[in-house]
Amino acid sequence: MPRLTIKKEARNAILLGAMCAISYLAVYIARNMLTATTTQIREAGAFTDGDLGTLSSIYFYTYAVGQLINGFIGDKVKPKYMISFGLIFAGVCNALFSAFANYPIAAFISYGSSGFFLSMIYGPLTKVIAENTTPVYATRCSVAYTFSSLIGTPTAGLVAVLVAWRVAFQVSAGSLLLMGTMCLICFTILEKKGIIRSGTNVIRPPKNKNKVKVLLERQILKFTVISVVTGIVRTAVVFWLPTYLEQHLHFSPDSATLLFTLCTSILAVTSIVAVFSYEALKRNMDLAILIYFSVSTCAFVLLMFVTHSVLNIAVMLLALLGSTCADSLMWSRYCPSLYDTGLTSTATGYLDFISYVAAATASNIFPHAKDAIGWTGLILVWAGLMLIGVMVSLPWKKKLAAE
């Protein structure tokens, strides 16, 4: 009987994980479509570089603020509705964006709205996985949709290569609408079968106990710092990677773009590396994160002394891999571990909000810092960020149990 139970748990986890992973892939295709089609849009004269920068900033901040708001709402509303309607409304906004390209204000509003609706997905995804699977399967399911997010960038790039930019946004819109509809249907079916049950394994904090205090007891401050430093590397550093390849390593623009695509494709395996190493370390999350940050710190320091272009790229990948592994384990292990508090979506949305605000700020600072202190100085700053990760990961307090 126990064996049959385990098989049933695994099957249910696979169903949930697959549905969430495919849904999140649609989210990241949509998120990265503007970046992937920037060259086409510029050549077509649809938007200027200034317009594209404004669009990117509007999206970035609406997504970040939306994570905070929708994370809180996600603990009050069924994940089925948050995820499904978030995907559907984002799909409508993507379609409107390409249709309103000749009307800048309407285009800005529709694209910004897309960011807000896409922020409805991640917190509820984490919540539904955490509350309906065991901790081991929750980690593996979370890794599955983290992997989906990492392959979203090259997938968006592939779509952009194959079709014109307006069509690319229509493809993105179609995938969001399709996945939103499928999620609504599939979640309803899984609810009827008892595979998804709202509030499973949740132990609500006593009414007289402050929710902030509950999260403080679960190391939310530590993971706030981790979210900040990994968010900067995951988003801002990776964003400036093509410029680094072109200016510091002297690759041509075309070669830098190709290498960037290759590097981001390699980084897609990060979530797999994170979960396997976590398992190998006997599911000791604190030790795993400490090792990841230590590797990343050493790699960034080494980067300043490696002059050979190919070796330099390899060391850069190692540095990014270490940081992204720590980031992946935070989303796939720490956030689901809050299933018994009833605050999974709130905490996830908060951490994502902090991550993106930090990345937005850093992305604006980095080009000025590069001009002031050069690439070597900027690399030293990146190493310093990872060293902060090492410091907060040291066992100052009792280790957080993995299970």
Residue ranges and their predicted role:
Residues S110-S148:
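Cytoplasmic helix-loop-helix junction between adjacent transmembrane helices
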Residues N284-M330:
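C-terminal transmembrane helical hairpin of 12-TM major facilitator-type secondary transporters
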Residues G66-K78, S271-N284, K370:
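Helix-to-loop junctions at the C-terminal end of transmembrane segments
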Residues V65-Y103:
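Conserved MFS/SLC helix-loop-helix module at the cytosolic interface between two early adjacent transmembrane helices
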Residues P2-E9, E191-F223:
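Juxtamembrane intracellular "pre-TM" segments in multi-pass secondary transporters
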Residues Y145-E191:
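Helix-loop-helix hairpin linking two adjacent transmembrane segments in secondary transporters
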Residues L338-I373:
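A late C-terminal transmembrane helix in Major Facilitator Superfamily
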Residues L34-T35, R218-I272:
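Extracytoplasmic gate region of multi-pass secondary transporters
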